[in-house]
């Protein structure tokens, strides 16, 4: 008895006094559960019913205090009483002192264990816990509560040995249950430690572990195994997670493997998951790899032939980019050739970039050459030849042309030609006027002849009035104009100039008679002068 050995020694006290105290307290002590009123320990048919009633009964606090005080006084006599005596006194003392040998009696009676253990607890409550009701202690010592406590404590020990690398919802639920059990047990543990309750009732009240209890104790282990399987199925196979991001369900970290081998990150051990910026779930190049090595490792990777560090498109050198703001690329997303192929597969026609054409306006019209094609140019010359001569500086300017005219006018043949041309013009005017006056002169002569008294002559004159008059007048006028016309025809180049200048073009004014006398050269100069005038006037 651990509780009895811990109590102080009462051997110096008179045994008679102790016996008297026990006899007085026999009436106040409660009747032990599952026993008859006559003190016999044989159970009757109503043993189970009485045990339930005793369990439900709530003892008074004054009885608890009285029993506790008298139990200390009677503790010394418990060891001196022989357990094998057959007298009636010994039987009554054994009935009164059930607290001393409850372990020997309860081993044969499993139905009495709960009540006796509860009485032991209530009888051994110290004076410091008088306000605590005994009902709580009886519930605490119930075998069902003790079994649950053992299950939770064993589960707590198992969960402590279990690794916390991959906790799951199942583990968290079990841990929460263990924590609550620990809190409730810790709240009541001071009552057990501070009290003088013997440990043997606890062991006696708890039955030996059976197969069912072992299965219940081992049930947290089975739950942890299931949680381990769940955590293994959800955790990635690689030892690190890029930026702490978890891939979407169903994708996992085998994204680059399921891409049909198009392109993967060249970093050794990287499966293409995550991104350097944290904005994407995967990457395909070193620029977005969160596990990107330093420059020396990249250079070593470049020496390896199986490492992809540039665009994998056939015929692509890595130059250019789809966006246009970059000069190179290393992946299919920026390859312009792959982009064109993708658009071709979709059936989208891309228009090639065209160079900007200049806007049609005044500047272009100013740059266009003028249309200087002239009709009626001298023989052997064309508009292209005139333009070439003008660009080469062979065509004289207007001032040069004026000087040339003055120089030609000072010479004698030019002056005589001008005078003859003037006289010719005057003679032509006189010929026209004389031809108009001829009919009037003929009429006057006819009138004069009619007044003559010779009648035979008049009919002859009337018969041919116009013939004799027209005959002498026409040859007279022809004779007067013949010398000038012959002189003009005999002049060198005059006839050719007349043939060419007889039908001038409509938009150009007629040539002056002075310009017509210079021959082919004068005609060329005249045409050049006219072109310059047209350019100045804007024709």
Swiss-Prot record:
Compositionally biased tracts (Basic and acidic residues): 60-69
Entry GO MF terms: zinc ion binding
Inactivation phenotype: Knockout in the rectal epithelial Y cell results in impaired formation of the PDA motor neuron. Knockout in Pn lineages (the precursor cells of the ventral epidermis of newly hatched animals) results in the defective formation of ventral cord motor neurons.
Gene3D superfamilies for this protein: 4.10.320.30
Biased composition regions of type Polar residues, renumbered to the chain: 97-117
Protein task: Transcriptional repressor which promotes neuronal differentiation during embryonic and postembryonic neurogenesis. Together with components of the MuvB corepressor complex, negatively regulates the expression of non-neuronal genes during neurogenesis. Required for the generation of postembryonic neurons from epidermal cells.
Membership in a protein family: Belongs to the MYT1 family.
Protein name: Zinc finger protein ztf-11
Organism: Caenorhabditis elegans
Gene giving rise to this polypeptide: ztf-11
């Amino acid at each position: 008895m651990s509780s009895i050995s811990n109590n102080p020694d009462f051997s110096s006290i008179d045994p008679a006094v102790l016996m008297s105290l026990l006899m007085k307290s026999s009436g106040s002590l409660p009747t032990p559960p599952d026993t008859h009123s006559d003190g016999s320990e044989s159970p009757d048919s109503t043993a189970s019913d009485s045990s339930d009633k005793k369990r439900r009964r709530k003892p008074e606090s004054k009885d608890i205090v009285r029993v506790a005080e008298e139990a200390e006084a009677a503790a010394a006599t418990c060891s001196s009483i022989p357990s094998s005596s057959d007298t009636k006194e010994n039987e009554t003392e054994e009935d009164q002192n059930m607290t001393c040998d409850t372990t020997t009696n309860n081993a044969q009676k499993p139905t009495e264990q709960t009540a006796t253990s509860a009485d032991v607890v209530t009888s051994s409550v110290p004076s410091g816990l008088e306000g605590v009701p005994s009902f709580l202690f009886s519930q605490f010592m119930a075998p069902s509560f003790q079994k649950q406590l053992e299950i939770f404590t064993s589960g707590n020990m198992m969960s402590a040995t279990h690794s916390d690398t991959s906790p799951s919802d199942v583990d968290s639920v079990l841990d929460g249950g263990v924590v609550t059990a620990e809190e409730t047990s810790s709240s009541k543990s001071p009552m057990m430690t501070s009290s003088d309750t013997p440990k043997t009732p606890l062991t006696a009240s708890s039955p030996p572990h059976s197969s069912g209890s072992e299965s219940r104790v081992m049930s947290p282990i089975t739950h942890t195994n299931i949680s381990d399987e769940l955590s293994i199925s959800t955790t990635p196979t690689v030892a690190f997670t890029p930026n702490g991001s978890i891939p979407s369900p169903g994708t996992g970290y085998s994204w680059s493997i399921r891409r049909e081998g198009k392109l993967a990150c060249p970093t050794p051990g990287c499966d293409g998951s995550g991104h350097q910026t944290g904005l994407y779930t995967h990457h395909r190049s070193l620029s977005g790899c969160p596990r990107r090595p330093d420059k020396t490792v990249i250079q070593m990777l470049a020496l390896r032939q199986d490492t992809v560090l540039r665009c994998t498109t056939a015929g692509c050198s890595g130059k250019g980019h789809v966006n246009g703001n970059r000069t190179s690329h290393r992946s299919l997303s920026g390859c312009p050739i792959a982009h064109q192929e993708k658009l071709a597969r979709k059936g989208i026609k891309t228009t090639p970039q065209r160079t900007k054409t200049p806007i049609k306006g005044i500047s272009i019209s100013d740059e266009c050459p003028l249309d200087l094609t002239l009709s009626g140019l001298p023989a052997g010359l064309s508009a292209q030849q005139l333009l070439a001569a003008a660009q080469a500086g062979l065509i004289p300017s207007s001032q040069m042309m004026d000087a040339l005219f003055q120089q030609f006018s000072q010479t004698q043949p030019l002056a005589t030609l001008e005078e003859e041309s003037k006289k010719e013009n005057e003679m032509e005017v006189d010929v026209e006027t004389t031809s108009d006056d001829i009919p009037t002169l003929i009429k006057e002569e006819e009138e004069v002849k009619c007044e003559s008294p010779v009648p035979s002559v008049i009919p002859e004159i009337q018969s041919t009035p116009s013939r004799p008059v027209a005959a002498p007048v026409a040859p007279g006028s022809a004779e007067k104009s013949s010398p000038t016309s012959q002189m003009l025809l005999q002049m060198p180049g005059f006839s050719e100039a007349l043939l060419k200048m007889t039908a001038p073009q409509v938009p150009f004014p007629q040539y002056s008679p002075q310009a017509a006398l210079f021959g082919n050269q004068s005609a060329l100069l005249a045409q050049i002068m006219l072109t310059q005038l047209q350019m100045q006037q804007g024709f």
